[in-house]
Amino acid sequence: MAKIVMKFGGTSVADTDRILHVAKLVKKKFDENNKVIVIVSAMAGVTNDLVQKSKKISENFPADEYDALLSSGEQVTSTLLSAALQDLGIKSRSWLGWQIPIVTDGDHKNSRIVSVNSKILNDCLDQNIIPVIPGFQGLSHENRITTIGRGGSDASAVAVAKCVDADFCEIYTDVDGVFTTNPDIESKAKKIDKISYEEMLEMASLGAKVMQSSSVQTAMINDVEIYVKSTFTNNPGTQILSEDKISYENVITGVAYSKDDAKITLQGVKDKPGVASKIFKPLFDNNIVVDMIVQNISADNKKTDVTFTIKRDDLKKTKSLMEVLKSELGYDSILADDQVSKVSIVGAGMITHPGVAYKMFNALSSKNINIQVISTSEIKISVLVDEKNTKEAVQVIHQVFELDK
């Protein structure tokens, strides 16, 4: 007997036929003498539809009402699935996030889960009742519904798994697991059988869409094993677990990419102490996340160019903030570019293997792809390239590291 949290994404519950299919999957797991908790996303397209409705009402839709509105999508799914389970003869009950409660830090539109009360959930399990919970939402200390951000149902599932001390958490989606890269870009991409928390966290934060990064981080901190698998096949999927349980055969585990980035360059910035702090403080104050940073010193050591990347959605605001600071920073000009993409390789194996960066850069050079910015960590190398080169960059890197074998 195992205690399992099963989470189903929007494509898995896209319509009533798929919800009925999911109910059969849950029943099968329950019939195998497991204790089961289910987390669900909104049906595919519902959240986007609610967002559009809010915009038609007001471009300044109140954040607390926005969260209350968007949370309704998952609530619909949870009640439909619970009813479907009951129709199969399984004892089930839907619970809303505030009833449990799942408590958040209260940050509307992008909350972090602070705690989950396990009493209701464990009481259900003790009575062989399957609780079905809407993901993506929780309750603030002000008793307001808050949402956890896009992909937040993954975070809900991992938090619940941690709370009830589940044996593992299963994330069901429309793909067979985590792949070496996006199969839509590289047809030779292969499914990864096992991947470490650290690698998956990098892949998720760098653009891989299968898992939400904060959910992977929570799983890593609390050692919650995750299986990513398809709702529509019987394949075993990808297991996400601690690094010490994996035997690495490849230097590189995967290639990720993101087209959500933009680049800002401040040319001719005065080269003196404190300038970098003045550049990035207003971005911090406005919750703008800075990713890659490059600084070039001029020959006379009096001026420098500072280049950094942010999310594309933040480009307009960032450019405006920098223009306000022009006289204080004393830079000559500002350049903004939203036609870039970030391509990254991830792999714990690169820690002990020399020449990984050379191999990546040489592969890009062979296709005449220019590298604009580079950033690295122990298990990651990222480069910024022209967006038009994204597909070719991913393909040549995937090929040179033989990830199709």
Where do the PLM segments sit?
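Conserved beta-strand termini and adjacent loop/short-helix elements that scaffold enzyme active sites
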Residues: 95-97, 229-231, 293
